[in-house]
Amino acid sequence: MSLQGPVSVDLLAKEIPAVRDLAYFGLMQTRLYGRDVMISRTGYTGERGYEIFCRGKDATHLWDSILGAGKDMGVRPVQFSTLDMLRIESYLLFYPGDNSETFPFDDEPCGDTLWEL
């Protein structure tokens, strides 16, 4: 599951203080709400975020625990299209869905060219 946004580190740090020092693209194996997890400091939203990998049998417990602990911080579930909008706003493009499959300067003389999104 993915925990993205400006309060993600504060929420996780309540249970795992060392998460504050996790480098971008870093991984750590630890325990979260009493369950074994692997946490990566990754995401595709342009915000600080984490992805939490767990056993299937632990997913519901972790989901409920994260939402409960984060309720007063504004943490709430969102659908994938919300994450997709953040990704596009941060110019993290998904090829070829967000841009052309052709190079915009093919067969064009030097000069003003508008990039497409």
Which sequence ranges carry the predicted segments?
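Conserved, structured C-terminal
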Residues: M1-L117
